[in-house]
Amino acid sequence: MGLIRHMATGDGIGTPRSSVARPCARAPLASLILLCAVCMWCGCGRPSRPDAAAGPVPKPPGPQWFADITEASGIRFTHRTGTNYDMPDQVGSGIALLDFDQDGRLDVYCVQDGRGGAGGRNQLFHQEADGRFRDVSAGSGADLAGRGMGAIAGDIDNDGLPDLVVTEHGAVRLLHNLGGGRFEEIAAEAGIDDPRWAVPASFIDFDRDGWLDLVVGNYVDHDPTQICHDAQGRQDFCAPAAFAPTSTRIWRNVTGRRGAPPRFEDRTEVSGLTRAPGVALGLVCADLDGDGWPDIFCADDGRANRLFINQRDGTFREEAALRGLAFNAMGRPAANMGTAFADCDGDGLGDLFVTHLTEEFHSFFRQDQRGLFTDSVARSGLQDAGWRGTGFGAVFADLDADGWPDLAQVNGLVRRATPGQTPVGDGVDPWWARYAQRAQLFANDGTGRFRDISAANPAFSGEALVGRSLAVGDLDGDGAPDLVTGNLGGPVRVHRNVVPARGHWLKLRLVDPAAGGRDAIGAEAVVVAGGRRHWALLQPATSYLSSHEPALHIGLGKDPGYATVEVSWPDGTKERFAGGTADASVVLRKGTGTRATP
């Protein structure tokens, strides 16, 4: 099985301011995990750096949900960025999980800030048969040296191999997967090169023609000569209010034939997206109004969020305020950054979580009826957490497989902290240590309410980092969702799911043979088990600058099997598939189920 298999307003990026498991089966890895835990608590080689805003020191652990296996994994990546208060320096550090060579094992792609004063290139890590990761960046063509932000994975030409889109300050890059571990950058040839500041991105089949289209959220119209200061007159990072908003962009995939050179056409103007510019840091592309056509939600930094509803004719209409997604529970715009989307209360409707600044409450938009949302953070339990960070990457995943999605979130400040005494993680650039905060973990109690269990999980929440990206995927193939975090000015962290006494589970891959066998991004599934209907959406590009494993992880709790799976494919067709026993990974292929009535 291999090594890993056994092993309110505020400042900064946010709102305007005045200055314009399973136990390890092999003893060596178990010993390594125990040693890492001892080092964490004894402070082996870990200095304490000042940062009062990092969050409370976790209590001694009981049964933990994660083990930090970064060292054992073989992934060696440290994000480097500038230290001169240039605004793009505090935005990036994306992570993408993908199986680029289709060998059945997840690989990891890490985005670097190659032009932010520190140099460096993006890195691609291949998972070997023994479960360790090997750096295969050199010679792959994927080792870009731009001012990187995030990355998403998806098969743009229906050849069965996932490609990569990388967003940068001043560019959108397209890495076409040629096979054999080789990528070619073809953004200009494909028609998606763009000089704006691209941050989030997502694939979407907005016209339901079987080809993945591309949405890119641009941030601000950045002027690098603009200098900003804090309330004390010290130079500081500019807030987005210092610059003009920009338009989210959409490109239609017009490749048309498998094996043809990938081609896109810019549909931004005709789609209507330019009528509502914004300051996008997060995206969710999903059918949010229940008509079977994918829509576009933009989490906007310091402004009202935008929701573009698909009009089924190639155009979109902005309806965020109408549907309850524009403002927070106080009726105000907030520092909207990271996103997570899942059915948290079991009513069959997706709920939307959006992260904010430390001094703001995060938003938990519960979908009360199809297409209408209410910020219900007060009754979600998330507002009751003992401590609140400046949130970026966030994921809903059923980490303990009890049938209810839990929430993981990484945090990192956007303005310097008041000096204090809390430990900052190894490898964090000392200049960035004052922006470090702990990650948080929340358990779903089975009613859609969440309980903060961060203090009992120091392997995930015990050290302060400048958290940005957070990607979820089953790295070791044991059916349990693992986590990979990307940290500004610091190292990537790999966290293996070791939840004791996990429930039963089902992992689904939804693929379309007519589209080269690629993952059916945008598909929805309902797993019927034990009298419950577990709804899930296949959309890897949520969180913050991240791309998750393109699979659905369904916790079944005590149910040893499932009765049926109902799939709504991106083109609007619906199929029903027979059930089976739990604790299995299953591939469902479009066209092989029983046709269901829409």
Locations of the language-model features?
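Beta-propeller blade termini
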Residues: 85, 91-102, 126, 147-162, ...
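Asp-box/WD-like beta-propeller blade repeats and closely related beta-sheet repeat scaffolds
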Residues: 139-152, 167-206, 220-241, 245-247, ...
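Hydrophobic beta-strand segments that make up the repeating blades of beta-propeller
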Residues: 105-112, 159-168, 214-218, 291, ...
